[in-house]
A protein has these predicted regions:
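Solvent-exposed, amphipathic alpha-helical segments
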Residues: 112-115, 161, 333-343, 360-364
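Rossmann-like dinucleotide-binding domain that binds NAD(P)(H)
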Residues: 190-272, 276-283, 352-355
């Protein structure tokens, strides 16, 4: 079996907590190098990686898989570390670069890795701004390499199985999707609250999951055509201060966002999604997919995940999907990209999906800026293009400032 050599750029939280468990379970991937600018983070990542791989060695032995045990043992011994992406990309024969840095560095590192001859996958969001996404799209075209926008929800049993039932026609034609992704906030990492680094708040962090998932459910053959910051909250700041770096501080990125998206297909069909991206817990409708003949409602408890399908007469069918773990979907995206590299197939969730998702986010900011008026994607892109012509290389920074300027404390 051919194995894909992988170098990780950014070895901190999302790599150690989510990607790393996936790598140890994906035989198609051979993790050869870790890179991080922080020596402390890098040492910890190396230690955790080798520890986990050696634990998997023992598991493989117990399962009667000596060849797998030897492979994992060799992988653990071979991992090398670097403090700069440039050095790693120049010294290693990397098939695939996995970029797990804060958002500000996504697009320059992706472009660098593509130009070095590596295929690339990048943790969501693709970049801080739509204009930065365009730089990556250009690099993909110039190099002919593959790019995967890492939206792990596509590999989660809830969304994957809901998509199956929607395509089967069991609820008729999909009309409306509610997708909420919310938690209490990432106070543990100061960079999330810095727009210069993060590019936005809860909408760009959590909300992109909901946006791409709602698009996936509707079908990537459709396109997002219009966006509206939804009443009453729109995109706003719900808490005036947060405990950041050990003390109460004000902040300027949104901690709550409610957005309406219209999707249209070439045949004239259309549907709507309401998405919430929040760091102040959910206050929108629970996730559900509503069709002309019924709806799908996902639920999860200690027994596992259940999809409840309710038809137009109120009859209920429950589909048990078993238990899931938080990290299993990350293994799915890693395996998918490795097999794309091996086969040469384009990832389903590619650079265009990533860029359009970012465009939806920024069109929502523009809608908020314009009093929550609906904004078409074409309208937003013309706005961004005009800024690019006027501001040149400073355009992404100006666009970022203008889009976030309308976010205020909700009162």
């Amino acid at each position: 079996m051919r194995r894909v050599t992988v170098g990780v750029i950014g070895s901190g939280g999302i790599f150690q907590g989510a990607h790393l468990p996936g790598y140890s379970d994906v035989q198609e991937a051979k993790l050869v190098a870790l890179c991080d600018v922080s020596e402390e983070v890098l040492k910890n990542a190396e230690k955790r990686t080798k520890k986990l791989y050696l634990e998997r060695v023992e598991n493989a032995k117990e399962d009667g898989k000596p060849e797998l045990a030897e492979q994992l043992k060799g992988d653990a011994a071979d991992i090398r570390t670097y403090k700069s992406a440039e050095e790693m990309l120049s010294k290693e024969d990397i098939d695939l670069a996995d970029i797990c840095t804060p958002t500000k560095f996504h697009n320059p590192l992706a472009v660098m890795a593509l130009k070095s001859g590596s295929n690339v996958m990048v943790e969501k969001p693709m970049a801080r701004t739509y204009l930065e996404c365009l730089d990556v799209i250009e690099a993909v075209k110039d190099t002919g390499k593959l790019y995967q926008h890492n939206e792990n929800w596509l590999y989660d049993p809830i969304w994957y199985n809901a998509k199956k039932f929607i395509e089967s026609g069991i609820i008729g034609e999909l009309q409306l999707v509610f997708v909420a992704t919310a938690h209490g906030g990432p106070e543990w990492a100061s960079w999330f609250w810095d727009p210069e680094i993060a590019g936005g708040g809860a909408l760009l962090d959590n909300g992109v999951h909901a946006i791409t998932a709602s698009w996936y459910l509707n079908g990537f053959e459709k396109s997002p055509v219009a966006v509206k910051a939804a009443e009453p909250y729109g995109i706003c700041i719900r808490m005036k201060t947060r405990l950041l770096q050990g003390m109460f501080k004000p902040f300027i990125v949104e901690d709550d966002a409610h957005v309406l998206i219209r999707y249209e297909g070439e045949s004239g069909g259309w549907s709507t999604a309401h998405v919430e991206g929040s760091w102040s817990h959910r206050d929108s409708m629970e996730t559900r997919m509503i069709g002309t003949n019924g709806e799908i409602q996902p639920h999860e408890d200690e027994k596992g995940v259940v999809l409840k399908i309710v038809d137009s007469f109120g009859s209920i069918r429950e589909i048990s999907l078993g238990k899931r773990t938080w990290t299993m979907s990350f293994g799915g995206e890693i395996r998918n990209m490795c097999n794309c590299v091996i086969s040469g197939a384009r990832p389903v969730c590619d650079e265009n999906i990533g860029a359009e998702t970012t465009a939806v986010v920024q069109a929502a900011y523009l809608s908020q800026k314009r009093g929550k008026r609906a904004v078409t994607l074409d309208e937003f892109k013309e706005y961004a293009s005009t800024l690019r012509e006027k501001e040149g290389k400073d355009a992404p920074k100006v666009l970022l400032k203008e889009m976030l300027g309308a976010i205020k404390v909700y009162a």
